[in-house]
Amino acid sequence: MAMTWNDLQQNALGLTTSPALLLVDMINGFTDPACALGTDCPEVVAANLQLLKTFRALGLPVFFTTVVYRNDQQAQVFRQKVPALNVLQSDSHWVKVDSALEPLDGEPVIEKQWASAFFDTDLDQQLSALGVDSLVVTGLTTSGCVRASAVDALQNNYQVVVAEEAVGDRNPEAHRANLFDLNAKYADVLPVAQVLSQLTALCGDKG
């Protein structure tokens, strides 16, 4: 018998008492539909802001990612496959975090060239140094960098929660299919309200 969404929830691991928030590519190039890579997603931005405020209030670590290309040699094949990525140059407006989610001093912005926040970056080392052992993953896009980052987080032995309303995709079908896959094998896909409830229960005394 095929697994249902409810079946998958039976295997939820949840968060630990040492979580961090990873906002994947919540940058102008993806949140602004004027960019070829972008989509109109104010509800995703709002959900990210809600989580961001809670993590900050609880004194928990926050990490952002962006995609930046500093020379023509970086990620050549990826950029040939997706030429729209070429707008993500180091001096471009498109690589900056959406102003609604402006990082604070001390909140790292991880530069990456590929889909995963972990591939060829020092994210794992930074998380390990802080004693982080679970991640709330949000951002854009569900079928691309969010999925790749969530899978790599698991493969680096983090418990992973994907905040359902805080991720988005240009293609609704791809969004739904990838959330199902993530929930089946790599992460807990939970509503933002449930994530906030877990955070308060586990870490409320840290704020």
Whereabouts are the PLM-identified features?
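Active-site acidic carboxylates
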Residues: 1-104, 108, 199-207
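Internal catalytic-core helix/loop-beta-alpha segment
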Residues: 91-140
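Short acidic-hydrophobic, aromatic-tinged amphipathic segments that line or gate anion-handling sites
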Residues: 110, 188-195
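Short glycine/serine/threonine-rich phosphate/pyrophosphate-binding segments
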Residues: 142-149
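Active-site-proximal loop->helix
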Residues: 170-183
